[in-house]
Structures are given as C-alpha cells and as structure tokens.
Amino acid sequence: MSSQNPVWTTVSTAPDMLGESPFWHPTEKMLYWIDIPGKKIHRASLDGMVTEGWDMPQEPGCIAPAKRGGLVIALRDGIYRAAYWQSELVKIASIDYDTTTQRFNDGKCDTAGRFWAGSMFEPRTERLAALYRLDARDTVEHKKPPKFDIVQKDAILANGLGWSPDNKTIYWADTVDQIIHAWDWDEATGSMSNKRVFQKFDAKPAGWTPENTMGVNYQGRPDGCAVDTQGNYYIAMYDGQRILKFAPSGQLLAAIPTPTRCTTMPCFGGEDMKTLFITTSSFMRPAEEMKAQPLAGHVFSMQVDVPGLPVNFYQE
C-alpha cells in the first residue's frame, strides 16, 4: 500500500511556522497558502520568479479565491473579503464564538461558490468547534448580507473538508478524535445527511515513538485533504510523515511518504493538475526533530498520475 519513493521538490523560499490552506489559482498560475501563527498569506509561481507575502492582522485559518477577484479569508474574528492582492480587508461575516479560545482552521469553497470554514477549540478539551457555511451568492446585486450558518457542531479541531467529483459526498474530519466522516451531499441546498465513518485512526499513546510503536498502528493525525478526479481522498497525516490516499470506498490505496514529519494539507495544481503540493509545519516541534528535518515548514511538490480537482471559487 506504500507509494514508491516519491520525488519531492521544495517550492517555498523560506519555512513557515504552520503552513496551511494551499490552492492553485488556474488563471494567475500561482500557488497560494497561509502561515497561521505567522499571520501571513503567501503566493508563488512555480518557476520561483514571483514569491510574495501579505501580513494579516490576525491568524488566517483558511483562504479561497473569489470569482470577482481577490480572496475570501477566515481570520480569527470573522470572514473577510479582499478585492485584490494586498487590498483592504472588509469583514463580511462576524463570528459568535469566544475568540480568546477559538479560531477558524480548515476551509474551502464548494462548487456552488459557498465558503465553508471549520473552527477549532484551542485548549482541545471541549467540543466547541463547528463547521460554518457562508452563502453570499447574489448578495452584491441585491445589496443584502450573506447567509452565515452553523452546519455541524460538537467538534474539537475541524479539518479534512472536501467533496467528491460527482458532488454527492462531503467529507469532514476531527483531528483530535482521529476520525473522518462522510455525508450525502446536496449541491443545490448545501445540506448534509446520512453521516457515517469514512476512516478511523489509532490514537498516539503516551510514550509512543517511531522506534517504540507499543504495538499501535499510529499513522499521525488527520489534517487537510484534497480529492482527485477519480474521487480518491488524500489526507495529510500530521505527525505521521505521510499522506494517505483512500478510494471512495474507503480502501487504502497508498501511503505516500512526505519530506517532513508534520504535513498539514495537500492540493493539486499545475497546468495539468498533476502536481501535488503539500504544506508542512515547524511549529513547536522538538529541537531534535528540527535538526533532523531542517526543511520542516516548507512547501513541497511532487508529480502524480491522476489529476486533482480544481479549486472552487467564492461567488457573490
């Protein structure tokens, strides 16, 4: 089930603390991603000729491109709109959680143009996180506020959001619970039904090390995801130094080794959508690990055989 010796290329010019939320912009031919604790949005061209950063006033949890141009950005205290790169940030939705203990984390747009963002409870002790849906379609012409709803509750650390190519299935993970759920998905209404377990992973017991597995098949913690055109689901396993590729049936197809231990999120890009990008983390990692993996926090890429789904754009 293991992928054979993938060849990874370093894309970024400097490491992030916690790289996340990558997407490939097909028009600009640029890769975007964020550094959450670094409070920054990055973008870069594949040839390395363009590498730019944009400082944020708060931690960005996730970003997505907008059809009218610019970005939609989930910051700690709400959802913001930027009309173009480094433009003014305009808040379009406020959040009702306690911003001292919660922030947005993983998120992206669906094919209808709604923006979905999951939150996390930073102490990781209570189920106060949720999945939010922002529907701003037709709001500009009709001068009305977007609809901002809670779709799912009772999570701790939201991650792994993705959709199947036929728009019939939605995936969402809770990193702390070591679980990925799937639901039936209605693109027209944005509704979820028929919740079921897609994958459940072994937790990391106290004292576990790569050398002393204690008989537990610990593979890391489920983080961000990407989906290819065949419906295969790629999940970054934080602390596991791998990406797991699952068929729509749930069958494990491959375990792809990654350059650093803490891979955070994959995405597809490039002209043919056969470049797999990954963001990684160096945040609060042990000194010995950082010494052994000096490229932790960088963005990497490798080539794959099956193209991925393109990024969905925010519509308003």
Where are these regions (language model features)?
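Hydrophobic alpha-helical segments and helix pairs
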Residues: 89-151
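A short loop-to-beta-strand structural motif that recurs across blades of beta-propeller domains
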Residues: 40-42, 78, 129-132, 179-181, ...
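Beta-rich, blade/repeat-based domains predominating
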Residues: 14-28, 56-74, 98-114, 148-169, ...
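Blade-level signature of beta-propeller repeat domains, shared across WD40, Kelch, NHL, RCC1
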Residues: 269-316
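Conserved beta-strand positions in repeat-built beta-propeller and related beta-rich domains
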Residues: 25-26, 31-36, 71-77, 115-125, ...
